[in-house]
């Protein structure tokens, strides 16, 4: 990555793609999403077990916070997260927490699925489980249920404007990310957060 390349430009590989939470400038949601290059996941490429757990088309009432892949990508951007496993754990946890419907039995069932049923590269280990739990609590502070929000109507909003509309508190997220960074000093995704 050269000095002029942003960490979310389309020349960046998926493993290093992320949107810093405190990036300067007036970036729109659409601008950042367009930086997800040719590696962007197609909905049909998502493993079936993940679709059953996380996709609203397969909602069987077991889990809260099911969102489309587009909405999921938007939430990655708004939370300043990349695409690695701890990033996924935070985005999923925050989304589920925002519903205010993630009761203990749902959380435990999701954790079982994420630890034992997800394909290996998507599985949550103990570190990801902690990140998920932090995010679940952080998501409860969000005034909007992100699983019900129509992100397509807000593609041209600035990131800060959309965070403000959804009452996503960047300073609270900073505290969550500082804690995560201290907990996982060898984790690439945790170290690049702040």
Residue ranges and their predicted role:
Residues 5-160:
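Core of folded catalytic or high-affinity ligand/protein-binding domains
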């Amino acid at each position: 990555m050269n000095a002029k390349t942003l960490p979310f430009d389309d020349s960046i590989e998926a493993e290093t793609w992320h949107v810093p939470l405190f990036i300067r400038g007036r970036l729109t949601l659409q601008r950042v999403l367009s930086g997800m290059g040719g590696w962007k996941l197609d909905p049909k490429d998502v493993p079936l077990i993940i679709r059953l757990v996380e996709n609203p088309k397969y909602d069987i009432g077991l889990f809260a916070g099911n969102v489309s892949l587009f909405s999921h990508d938007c939430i990655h951007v708004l939370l300043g997260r990349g695409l690695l496993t701890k990033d996924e754990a935070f985005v999923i946890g925050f989304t589920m927490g925002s519903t205010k419907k993630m009761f203990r039995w749902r959380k435990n069932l999701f954790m079982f699925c994420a630890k034992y049923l997800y394909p290996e590269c998507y599985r949550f280990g103990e570190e990801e489980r902690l990140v998920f739990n932090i995010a679940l609590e952080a998501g409860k502070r969000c005034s909007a249920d992100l699983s019900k929000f129509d992100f397509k109507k807000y593609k041209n909003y600035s990131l800060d404007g959309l965070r403000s509309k959804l009452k996503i508190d960047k300073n609270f997220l900073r505290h969550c990310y500082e804690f995560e960074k201290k907990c996982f000093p060898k984790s690439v995704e945790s170290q690049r957060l702040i």
